[in-house]
Amino acid sequence: VLCYHKVERRQELGVTRISPKRFAKQIERLARAGWRALSLSEVIACASGQRTAAPNELAITFDDGYRGLREHAFPVLEAHGFRATCFVITDFAGKLNRWDVAYGGRRFAHLAWRDMRAWQGRGIEFASHTATHPRLTRISELGVHEELDRSRRAMTEALGVGTMAVSYPFGAAGPREERLAREAGYAAGFGIARGWSRSVMSIARTPVYLWAPLTPAVGVLRAPEQLAALVANRCAIGTT
């Protein structure tokens, strides 16, 4: 399961941005190699043991839901017949990313609800990245419940469908957060840079950052890549 963040022309000091040209080349190489991108329900079925992923199957996800995806990522995926899941911060739909540290003073806009509705049914699914992007492990149980529940309700109201999954901000989640996500009505939870998935509420993903090769690593991260991803995550201050 691959995890992207920004696909933008504008540069910044952070590491989560991939240029549109580089993203297009990565997807083109995956398509040429015969990879097939799974839907969210198929990923959940694999993680829960209901199906086995074929050797040429992967999943593509995006965290944060930046507006640049509608111009630079979604059309590329559609052209190659690839599906993807975009995890959105619901309180910031259509707004600037003021929840995040502005490295170099640059702000990036998030997808608006109308953007998401325009891509529904075209291979792009939308799921929760909480309401405001806090590090869930550092807030109260009541706070975690509010973040998860408010986000799920906002998506149902704006998109007309419920969301099956949540991506934990910063990949930070333990047994408490996984339990609360399940209690809030989520069927799956996604982490980051964890190697093997522990359960359907803790699905591991391979982060694709600035330094990623043109052919992204698929499967369990190699030790150096996992260390780099963990360091990047630890250094991500965001709202905490």
Which residues does each predicted region cover?
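Short beta-strand and adjacent tight-turn residues that come in two discontinuous sequence segments
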Residues: 87, 129, 189-191
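Surface-exposed cleft-lining segments at the edges of enzyme active sites
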Residues: 96-107, 133-141
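Acidic (Asp/Glu)-rich catalytic clusters
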Residues: 31, 75-82, 109-128, 182
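Generic enzyme active-site microenvironment
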Residues: 61-62, 127
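A short, conserved beta-to-alpha structural element at the edge of catalytic cores
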Residues: 81-103
